[in-house]
Amino acid sequence: AYVSGLGRTRRVVVYDTLLAAAGPGPEEGSGGGADEVVLVVAHELAHVRHRDVLWGIIGAAALAAVSVLAAIALFDLGPVQRALGVSGLGDPLATPGLLLLGAAGSLVAAPAASAISRWAEARADWVSLEVTRDPVTAVAGERRVALENRADLRPNRLLMVMFASHPTTMARIAQASLPAPELTGFR
């Protein structure tokens, strides 16, 4: 499931695979079925409540602007121009150099962007647990998805820091397994 759009175009999309997995479902509160759909929708509505799509767009635009300005500033330095073999921004050969600097800037910014995304996902997980008070379903859902997707339960730490937009399966299970009083960390 995911949230998309802004204002009147805002939507929560639930995949047919989640609905199919819900099926007629086990007993309420047993960790699956319709309870899982409710938990997932609560998670997505937490993203709506906190305007995560809007903040994601603003963050990406700000990061892009900073990256472009940094690339231009770096490109104006003589040593960078000499290293790339160009005479300045007006040089047609400058385009590949600017693209290279942009890619390097994206790699430098990736850990921060990924950490913010993981934080927003963890916050939405907390909200869904606060709303549903159903950690059994949260754990069962994480296990089901991990098995279906053959998730790496111990992902490479560097790859996690650089590129992971969501907490690991094990982190989400650990979060859902905390005692109920701990479920007040995010609002």
Across the structure, where does each feature detected by a protein language model lie?
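Hydrophobic alpha-helical transmembrane segments
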Residues: 87-101
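Hydrophobic alpha-helical transmembrane segments of polytopic membrane proteins
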Residues: 99-111
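Polar-ligand-bearing catalytic/cofactor-coordination segments
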Residues: 1-89, 108-187
